């Protein structure tokens, strides 16, 4: 593969912005499959709650890395990096341009910049931390993480106990801050990368997100969540749309409140996505409808 001869187009943006429709048009223009960069669409049990491409959309354009794993499977951004790069080797033998699309920031960075190899934690450290969490909750673990790795503490979702524990177990096992393993220099890639960002005004995006959640409920999100409810302890299910439904199934909130929380948490997630993406000066930003023609000219 020669850098100047092959291009990876990356279509990114917050949840609900309209990536799916435009991605189909771009992929048809390129004549190549779509690579999904969604860390939850990869799980076959979650098509509704992750807004995975429909069978009709997949018949129109083949999609890779959608529904390929079970929620029971361990999967990471590092594994995704390796597998996508292998897939691109094959795809670039047939196509000059390939589209990667999604909103999972770590997955996009994994392909475009690369991820450091992070050592496995000592099993006894992990066991001790999970025992502490079960006995005392997360406050003490958070305090220790803040002391040992203030950078990671500042950006981690402190309600996500698995991510908090993972950060601390790496600190304790290696004697280094977890954040020190995060790559600052991008790996070289043997292809061009063109990043296309989609945006909408905040009010417009929030309305679209709220409407999409209601549409998901009509499509059967509640039933989909019930089917995986016995597996709620899995990290793949610690995600917006499912954890709120699980609270409803537990009886701690009613159905209407669960829907409201999914809408609210989806809006919060969209804001976090935009904060992350805005750090990347290589992204060119477009409105998915008003600038559609301009975007399509970029891939010709």
Swiss-Prot record:
Reaction(s) catalysed by this chain's protein: adenosine(37) in tRNA + dimethylallyl diphosphate = N(6)-dimethylallyladenosine(37) in tRNA + diphosphate
Binding residue positions for substrate: 15-20
Entries under Pfam families matching the protein: IPPT
Region (Interaction with substrate tRNA): 38-41
Gene3D superfamilies (UniProt xref): 1.10.20.140, P-loop containing nucleotide triphosphate hydrolases (3.40.50.300)
Annotated EC: 2.5.1.75
Regions annotated as coiled coil: none
Annotated signal peptide: none
Subunit structure: Monomer.
Family assignment from sequence similarity: Belongs to the IPP transferase family.
Protein name per its UniProtKB record: tRNA dimethylallyltransferase 2
Gene this protein is translated from: miaA2
